[in-house]
C-alpha cells in the first residue's frame, strides 16, 4: 500500500527545519549505503548521528505520534531516526530497494524495514525534477508533494529519485517496523479501519459498527507481533 499523508508538519515547523538544515554541514550520501546502492546514489545527507539531524528528527516523530491517519496505515512498532537528504545540480538516486534490516544508531536494537517514509521539506515549484518514482505490480508511481506532506510505501518497492535540474529537493526519510509485517494484511486492516470510521460518523456506535470494530481488533490481535 502506498499512501499520501498530508500536513504532517505545519508551515511553521517546515520553515524552522529548513532554516536549520540550510545552515547544516552535508556529506556525500554514498557514505550511508552499501556497495550496490553507492553505484546509483548521488546526493548529500546529514550524518546519521548529526546532533542537528537527531533534534529535527524528534520534531517529525512527535508530529507523527499525533497523526491518526499515519498510525492507522503504518501500525508502527519501531522507528529508525529520521534522516535528511538534499539533491541539486543533477543529483539523483537510481532504482534500488532499501535494505531489509537496519541497526538503530546509538542502540543495540535492529528493525525490519517494513515501510519507507519520505517527508517533503520544499514546495514542488521550488525545484525541477526530483520526483520519487515507486514501482510496484501496477506500474510506476510518480510522487512530488507539498512541503510538510509525506508518502508512505512498502520498503520492498523498487524506487528511485529523478535528477534535480533546478533548485534543491530537501526531504526527510526514514524506515519503520510495523506491528503487522505483511503488507496485504496491513492494507486490509487500514481499509477496514477507515470504513469503520466513516460508518461510525454516519451511524454512531450502533451494534453493527461495534461488531465491525471487534472484528478489526481481533484481526489485529491475530496478526500483530509486539
Curated annotation (Swiss-Prot):
Biological process according to GO: DNA damage response; intracellular iron ion homeostasis
Binding site for 2-oxoglutarate: 169
Alphabetized Gene3D superfamilies for the sequence: q2cbj1_9rhob like domain, Rabenosyn, Rab binding domain
Keyword Methyltransferase: no
Cofactor: Fe(2+); L-ascorbate
Binding site for Fe cation: 96, 98, 159
SUPFAM superfamilies: Clavaminate synthase-like (SSF51197)
Top-rank lineage group of the source organism: Bacteria
Top EC category: oxidoreductase
UniProt keyword annotation of Metal-binding present: yes
Keyword terms, alphabetized: Dioxygenase, Iron, Metal-binding, Oxidoreductase, Vitamin C
Coiled-coil positions: none
Co-factor remark: Binds 1 Fe(2+) ion per subunit.
Name under which the protein is recorded: PKHD-type hydroxylase mma_3620
Species for this entry: Janthinobacterium sp. (strain Marseille)
